[in-house]
């Protein structure tokens, strides 16, 4: 038996880090990715397409998204589509899952108990749903397979052994431990929630098929799962991402003018595509007229978007602080106050001094990066 598994597409996600136009483009790209997944399911002649939750955003989905999903999955018939709602697309009153009149080839699991769906070749799919956005318990607690054959789990949850390897801030929804899968009688579990792919002995996280934020790098895709007669599985990961999100660090040390910084950014991003976040670091010469928004606006055509942020970025000191501290001027008083402050670290002290002095000198452009 062959399945194509994916999860965590997050249709209609806001992409808060992106500008409105680019966020709109990224949301459209997620639809293209789902269409790519569906074509792959047909090309590989799988027995079913499975999704383990977070297919869309419950708080943001539109009627257009509902019709798109209905028609996209209906077009796959008679290929079966199995959906196990997660915490972002939980099943309940007002959910897209309840509003859509699905075609006969689509099955939506709708309870927090693992429910059997008999399949072909002696295989049973056991699926469950989140029915609230939070506080969903462990699906495997008190669950035990009660029949013969091959048994595959399909649900959205947090395998506790891998939680620390995921991006910080990931909430442990429906937490469980990997050894519970085998002890419950399941041969394997096809999962969702973790955006970083995991190939466990008895479980598979496909990862999100298209990056939603920076840091979600590497190959993004769906997983072709072959189930053998003894319940063992083989996996093939297939890239389906429409877009990419790249993180780049650029050292600006020694750059003496704005265009020199632009040139370094251009070199660092020349071979990249999609969205790129550039982190500037190093020591910037004090006379560089650098505006982050101007750099972002000059993004080359081969990039979808360019975001600039500061990392460990400092300004080369060009002021004689000892001499300035002796002045009976506003500048002198400012320098004395900052040097005598006990609440600042040395790095903070340098930033405050350079920023303040440049502002007093009417060189206010640097306020953007400090």
Question: What are the language-model segments listed below?
Answer:
Residues 1-68, 350, 354-370:
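N-terminal active-site segment of His-dependent metallophosphoesterases
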Residues 1-22, 220, 226-248:
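Domain-start "cap" segments at the beginnings of catalytic or binding domains
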Residues 5, 51, 83, 153, ...:
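Structural beta-sheet core signal
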Residues 27, 42-43, 74-77, 270:
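Residue-level signal for alpha-helix termini/capping positions
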Residues 31-42, 67-70, 140-144, 259-266:
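Amphipathic, non-transmembrane alpha-helical secondary structure
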Residues 41-45, 146-148, 269-272:
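Glycine-rich phosphate-binding loop signature in dinucleotide/nucleotide-binding domains
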Residues 48, 57-204, 208-221, 226:
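His/Asp/Glu-rich metal-coordinating catalytic cores
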Residues 232-370:
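Accessory, non-catalytic peripheral segments of nucleic-acid enzymes
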């Amino acid at each position: 038996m062959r399945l194509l598994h994916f999860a965590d597409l997050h249709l209609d996600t806001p992409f808060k880090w992106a500008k409105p136009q680019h966020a709109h483009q990224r949301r459209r790209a997620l639809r293209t990715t789902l269409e790519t997944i569906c074509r792959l399911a047909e090309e590989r002649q799988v027995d079913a397409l499975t999704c383990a939750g977070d297919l869309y955003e419950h708080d943001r989905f539109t009627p257009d998204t509902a019709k798109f999903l209905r028609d996209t999955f209906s077009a796959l018939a008679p290929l079966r589509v199995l959906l196990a709602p997660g915490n972002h697309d939980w099943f309940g009153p007002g959910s897209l899952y309840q509003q859509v009149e699905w075609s006969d080839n689509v099955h939506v699991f709708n309870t927090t108990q693992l429910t059997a769906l008999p399949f072909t070749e002696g295989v049973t799919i056991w699926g469950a749903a989140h029915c609230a956005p939070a506080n969903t318990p462990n699906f495997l607690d008190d669950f035990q397979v009660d029949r013969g054959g091959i048994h595959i789990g399909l649900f959205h949850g947090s395998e506790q052994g891998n939680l620390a390897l995921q991006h910080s801030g990931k909430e442990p929804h429906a937490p469980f431990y990997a050894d519970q899968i085998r002890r419950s009688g399941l041969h394997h579990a096809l999962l969702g929630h973790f955006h970083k792919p995991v190939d466990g002995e008895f479980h598979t996280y496909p990862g999100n098929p298209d990056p939603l934020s920076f840091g979600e790098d590497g190959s993004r895709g769906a997983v072709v799962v072959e189930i053998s007669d003894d319940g063992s599985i083989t996996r093939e990961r297939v890239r389906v991402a429409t877009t990419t999100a790249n993180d780049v660090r650029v050292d600006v040390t020694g750059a003496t003018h704005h265009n020199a910084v632009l040139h370094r950014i251009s070199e660092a991003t020349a071979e990249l595509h999609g969205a790129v976040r550039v982190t500037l670091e190093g020591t910037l010469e004090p006379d560089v007229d650098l505006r982050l928004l101007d750099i972002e606006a000059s993004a080359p055509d081969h990039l979808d978007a360019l975001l600039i942020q500061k990392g460990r970025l400092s300004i080369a000191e060009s002021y004689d602080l000892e001499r300035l501290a002796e002045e009976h001027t506003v500048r002198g008083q400012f320098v004395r106050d900052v040097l005598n402050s006990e609440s600042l670290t040395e790095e903070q002290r340098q930033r405050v001094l350079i920023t303040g002095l440049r502002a007093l000198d009417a060189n206010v452009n640097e306020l953007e990066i400090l």
